[in-house]
Swiss-Prot record:
Catalysed transformations (reactions): CMP + ATP = CDP + ADP; dCMP + ATP = dCDP + ADP
GO CC term, one of those recorded: cytoplasm
Keywords noted in UniProt: ATP-binding, Cytoplasm, Kinase, Nucleotide-binding, Transferase
Source taxon at top rank: Bacteria
Annotated source species: Paraburkholderia phytofirmans (strain DSM 17436 / LMG 22146 / PsJN)
UniProt xrefs under InterPro entries: Cytidylate_kin, Cytidylate_kinase_dom, P-loop_NTPase
GO biological-process terms attached to the record: pyrimidine nucleotide metabolic process
Enzymatic class: transferase
UniProt-recorded name of the protein: Cytidylate kinase
Chain positions recorded as ATP binding sites: 17-25
Molecular function via GO: ATP binding; CMP kinase activity; dCMP kinase activity
Coiled-coil segments: none
SUPFAM superfamilies, per the entry: P-loop containing nucleoside triphosphate hydrolases
Length: 228
């Protein structure tokens, strides 16, 4: 049996990037390819928000929110977000849940509790974490940091295709405007602005398929950890 490595030596791959860059899909497939655990950091905030709504906890009851976050049973499998063993991937995308997530995130103790939960996903044999500040803030010692991007046109086209496939109406011009505005907000915010870590590898997926992007990340990891 292989000896257990110290917590800080358990390998982490971070995949950060802007909205609709495809980082969530790529992260899930990289984790599956390597047999690693998966963390969807954006979904974690929404899962906490959904749980607070279900249990009738006020968005301003900081102590109760922190305890709730500490006790949550959350898993991510094959791109699905599970709360207490039940898939809630669709529920956490509801507008009410998004609003609650933004409301509870203003409290510093709540953010600290969520950061601790994110770091607790670091378990053997390894972790793939996707988000916006995984490599710059949460896992600064990650063995591989990837910053995924794509042209705003490519990202809008992907989002448009996803929405149409799910039966929603979508306007490509509206999506382009929304993505540009979100990019500007994310890159200029004071706390953890969206930017690549200094030691991140840049992956532009504008002209890549999902499989090609996954293959590139796995190749980078295996080059860094040849006995993986």
């Amino acid at each position: 049996m292989k000896p257990t490595r110290p917590f800080h030596q358990t390998p982490v791959i971070t995949i950060d990037g802007p909205s609709a860059s495809g980082k969530g899909t790529v992260a899930a497939l990289v984790a599956a390819s390597l047999g690693f655990h998966l963390l969807d950091s954006g979904a974690l905030y929404r899962l906490a928000a959904l749980a607070s709504l279900r249990y009738g906890i006020s968005g301003d009851d900081v102590d109760a929110l922190v305890k709730l976050i500490d006790d949550l049973h959350i898993t991510f499998r094959e791109g699905l977000a599970q709360l207490d063993g039940v898939d809630v991937s669709a529920e956490i995308r509801a507008e009410e849940v998004g609003g609650r997530a933004s409301a509870i995130a203003v409290h510093a103790p709540v953010r600290a509790a969520l950061v601790a939960r994110q770091r607790a996903f670091r378990k053997e044999p390894g972790l793939v974490a996707d988000g916006r500040d995984m490599g710059t803030v949460i896992f600064q010692d990650a063995v591989l940091k990837v910053f995924m991007t794509a042209s705003v046109e490519a990202r809008a086209a992907r989002r448009h295709k996803q929405l149409i496939q799910k039966g929603f109406s979508a306007n490509i011009d509206d999506l382009l405007r929304d993505l540009r505005e979100r990019d500007e907000r994310d890159s200029q915010r004071v706390a953890a602005p969206l930017k690549p870590a200094a030691d991140a590898k840049l992956l532009d997926t504008s002209a890549l398929s999902v499989d090609q992007a996954v293959e590139q990340v796995v190749q980078w990891y295996e080059a860094l950890v040849p006995h993986a």
